[in-house]
């Protein structure tokens, strides 16, 4: 369940006491279940901020957030984007880690071209996605990735930034059209500045000595779950090879 039963009781009590229109409620959730009951309760509050925890698209998100199913995520995206009241803000909370940093441009392009109504629209994430880093365990921290791989990732980011710069208005909702300039978009903290900042953070320390831990972790996960990292993350497949196997 998205929330425990007691949460509904608390919301009902706040509504009953007449305080709801003075209160902001925030959630960080994987959104597995979002019942109609909760949607109705949200309508009474001054503001509801729902940070939907999704880390990638398709099979990549299924792998990172095992055992999630992308088709279910899509249904929840649709529900949150179209069935929530106007006082509800929806953002994507992406945990940037060693498995998904290379594929963030794919996630962003999917989000920008999906045709969302209000999900993570300007000014949130500059109309893209909101991010935070995974710091622990160390073998999933982006600093574990070798520089030669980060070179490829940086190249991918710069190619995407060029595309996003040409299509920046995709993340600006109808109610902000004509009110946001490209200069403002370029200067946004969570836009292209954030993307380049992620690469800088990944290069800030060299933790590639922990790659053996990364390989062991992924290999054990695949054996336990019946998943296939190499197939799911093809650009990263070679990172599982021992140095003398390359």
What is the role of each PLM region?
Residues 17, 44-45, 76-90, 114, ...:
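A structural motif corresponding to the C-terminal end of an alpha-helix
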Residues 137-163:
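PAPS-dependent sulfotransferase catalytic core
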């Amino acid at each position: 369940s998205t929330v425990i039963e007691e949460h509904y009781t608390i919301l009902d009590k706040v509504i009953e006491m007449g305080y709801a229109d003075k209160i902001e409620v925030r959630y960080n959730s994987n959104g597995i279940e979002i019942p109609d009951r909760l949607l109705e309760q949200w309508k009474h509050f001054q503001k509801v901020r729902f940070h939907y925890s999704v880390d990638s698209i398709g099979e990549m998100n299924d792998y990172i957030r095992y055992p999630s199913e992308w088709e279910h995520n899509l249904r929840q995206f649709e529900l949150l984007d179209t069935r929530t009241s106007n006082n509800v803000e929806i953002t994507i909370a992406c945990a940037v880690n060693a498995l998904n940093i290379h594929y963030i441009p794919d996630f962003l392009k999917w989000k920008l071209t999906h045709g969302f109504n209000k999900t993570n629209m300007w000014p949130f994430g500059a109309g893209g996605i909101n991010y935070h880093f995974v710091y622990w365990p160390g073998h999933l921290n982006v600093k574990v990735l070798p520089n030669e791989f980060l070179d490829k990732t940086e190249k991918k980011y710069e190619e995407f930034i060029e595309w996003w710069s040409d299509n920046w208005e995709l993340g600006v909702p109808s109610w902000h059209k004509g009110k946001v300039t490209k200069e403002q978009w370029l200067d946004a903290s969570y836009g292209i500045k954030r993307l380049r900042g992620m690469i800088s953070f990944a290069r800030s320390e060299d933790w590639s000595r922990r790659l053996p831990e990364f390989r062991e972790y992924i290999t054990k996960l695949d054996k336990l779950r019946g998943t296939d990292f190499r197939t799911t993350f093809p650009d990263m497949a070679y990172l599982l090879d021992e140095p003398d196997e390359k």
